[in-house]
């Protein structure tokens, strides 16, 4: 993982936000290559899920035909939205504070191991990455027991890595930044929404929140979309946009950030068909990731147990990826596909529903009134053919664009061997990104900067630039230019050499196979287009 992080900074995929001032934890900036990768990822999602969907044909596995439309909602919404959605009361993580270091940690994210010395057993916790965890636990354990290096074998470190929430007690826990045991407080709830203030006065009535998810903007616009676009159930509304969560301990590169981008669909269907649609979207979303290059061996589909379900969920399945910073055998969430039932639309009609009731009813305050009053608007749907009126059920495929980009970067990072310009095999680093996701689709090189080669190369570059993001490079040995493009994930490199001036052909080199083929100059654009089309 360290090698990938280093490459991402060195080649301009990702930078720590505000790095010249020491950075801000949980915030990341996308560099020139990273912004293209992420844009390509979002474009692929939007095309495959929304704009490219054919509503006249029923896709394989779908119960029927359906429509898809898009939406772009504001980051700041009426505060009542978050009260009725349940986020105001229920959107929290459990945190612990260290009385000694005064630092705060997320209870279920801090890992560690039990260590034992002369019959005394303690739990040493750490924030180190998984690759360094055992060494860091051993180092801190030796320091706690005041052991010298020559006595290192007297300390036993258990192999099993655990998070704090798996322990019966924290009394014998050495906190990540503490020197003594038992300094952690009992876990308590911490609301993850960022507060902000509207207007100049800044009173309590002016307090609102940065959205923690894009979904609620879709729900409160449900009636607007139905009335304006004439869509009929079943249909979906897609949205891509920024969300914000005040994570207690952001970590693992961009995996857990405080500002992130979501790609979400809220799919509205008849309650009687909701389970069929849930299965359809679960399977379709899994297939999307493998089609773009994530291996089946690195992905799992995990159904949530009842006790894991969010307050709004009837059922949820997570698509999870084996990120390299996680312990072997563990997976991190890429996307959740949730069966939200009618929770959201009813909550925004009637008021916040109580998930503890079955069937769910509006949660009341001590005076017997709705705790958080809904809009009072009728968000039920009337079928103009059957005249049936009902509150639609919702299936929500919710993907993180940043986590997906990170997964594709992890999957793409490869070290193999390739010949240099002298034919000697050398280790190369290559990002084997799917051509649809690659930041640069092709690079154009003149072999040397003379004899008319730059002019031909520039003409090819200009023709390709009308269709794709391409790169022109005339500096250095051609082997080093290949290596630079391999690290950028560029699938095709086009070289203009001495023969190009006589036979009017160029060499196209494939990033993954290293195969080089001669193609007529006039056919270069169509050849690249053909190869790009074959990858879709």
Swiss-Prot record:
Annotated localization: Cytoplasm
Annotated keywords: Aminoacyl-tRNA synthetase, ATP-binding, Cytoplasm, Ligase, Nucleotide-binding, Protein biosynthesis
Reaction catalyzed: tRNA(Gly) + glycine + ATP = glycyl-tRNA(Gly) + AMP + diphosphate
Chain residues that bind substrate: 106, 213, 260-264, 396-400
Chain spans, region Insert: 56-67, 350-372
Binding sites annotated in the UniProt record for ATP: 245-247, 255-260, 333-334, 400-403
One Pfam family recorded for the sequence: tRNA-synt_2b
NCBIfam families: glyS_dimeric (TIGR00389), PRK04173.1 (NF003211)
UniProt cross-references to PANTHER family, sorted A to Z: DNA POLYMERASE SUBUNIT GAMMA-2, MITOCHONDRIAL, GLYCYL-TRNA SYNTHETASE/DNA POLYMERASE SUBUNIT GAMMA-2
Similarity comment: family membership: Belongs to the class-II aminoacyl-tRNA synthetase family.
Protein known as: Glycine--tRNA ligase
Organism whose genome encodes this protein: Rhodopirellula baltica (strain DSM 10527 / NCIMB 13988 / SH1)
Organism lineage: Bacteria, Pseudomonadati, Planctomycetota, Planctomycetia, Pirellulales
């Amino acid at each position: 993982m360290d090698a990938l992080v280093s490459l991402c900074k060195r080649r301009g995929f990702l930078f720590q936000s505000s790095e010249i001032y020491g950075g801000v934890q949980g915030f990341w900036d996308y560099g020139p290559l990273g912004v293209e990768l992420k844009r390509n990822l979002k474009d692929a999602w939007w095309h495959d899920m929304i704009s490219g969907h054919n509503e006249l044909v029923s896709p394989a596995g779908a119960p029927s035909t359906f429509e898809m439309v898009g939406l772009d909602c504001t980051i700041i919404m009426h505060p009542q939205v978050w009260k009725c959605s349940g986020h105001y009361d229920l959107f929290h993580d459990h945190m612990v504070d260290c009385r000694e270091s005064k630092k705060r940690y997320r209870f279920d994210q801090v890992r560690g191991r039990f260590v034992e010395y002369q019959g005394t057993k303690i739990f040493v916790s750490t924030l180190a990455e998984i690759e360094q965890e055992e060494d860091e636990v051993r180092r801190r354990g030796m320091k706690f027991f005041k052991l010298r290096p020559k006595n290192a074998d007297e300390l036993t470190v258990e192999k099993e890595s655990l998070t704090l929430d798996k322990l019966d007690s924290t009394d014998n826990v050495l906190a990540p930044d503490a020197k003594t045991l038992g300094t952690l407080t009992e876990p308590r709830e911490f609301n993850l929404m960022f507060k902000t203030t509207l207007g100049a006065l800044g009173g309590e009535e002016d307090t609102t929140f940065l959205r923690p998810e894009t979904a609620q903007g879709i729900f409160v616009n449900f009636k607007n979309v139905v009335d304006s676009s004439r869509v009929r159930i079943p249909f979906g509304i897609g949205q891509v946009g920024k969300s914000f969560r005040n994570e207690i301990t952001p970590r693992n590169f961009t995996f857990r950030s405080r500002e992130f981008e979501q790609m979400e669909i809220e799919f509205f269907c008849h309650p009687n068909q909701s389970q069929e649609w849930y299965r359809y979207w679960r399977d379709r979303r899994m297939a999307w990731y493998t089609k773009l290059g994530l291996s089946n061996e690195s992905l799992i589909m995990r159904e949530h147990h009842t006790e894991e379900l969010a307050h709004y969920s009837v059922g949820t399945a997570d698509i999870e990826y084996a990120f390299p910073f996680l312990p072997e055998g563990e997976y991190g969430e890429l996307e959740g596909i949730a069966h939200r039932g009618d929770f959201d639309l009813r909550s925004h009609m009637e008021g916040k529903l109580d998930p503890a009731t079955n069937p769910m009813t509006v949660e009341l305050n001590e005076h017997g009134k709705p705790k958080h009053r809904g809009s009072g608007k009728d968000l039920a749907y009337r079928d103009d053919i059957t005249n049936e009126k009902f509150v639609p059920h919702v299936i929500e495929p919710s993907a993180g664009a940043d986590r997906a980009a990170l997964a594709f970067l992890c999957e793409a990072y490869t070290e193999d061997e390739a010949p240099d310009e002298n034919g000697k095999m050398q280790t190369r680093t290559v990002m084997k990104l799917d051509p649809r996701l690659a930041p640069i689709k092709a690079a154009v090189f003149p072999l040397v900067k003379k004899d008319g080669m730059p002019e031909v190369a520039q003409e090819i570059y200009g023709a390709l630039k009308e269709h794709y993001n391409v790169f022109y490079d005339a500096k250095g040995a051609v082997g080093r230019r290949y290596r630079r493009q391999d690290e950028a994930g560029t699938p095709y490199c086009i070289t203009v050499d001495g023969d190009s001036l006589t036979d009017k052909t160029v060499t196209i080199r494939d990033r993954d196979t290293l195969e080089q083929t001669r193609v007529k100059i006039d056919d270069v654009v169509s050849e690249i287009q053909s190869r790009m089309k074959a990858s879709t």
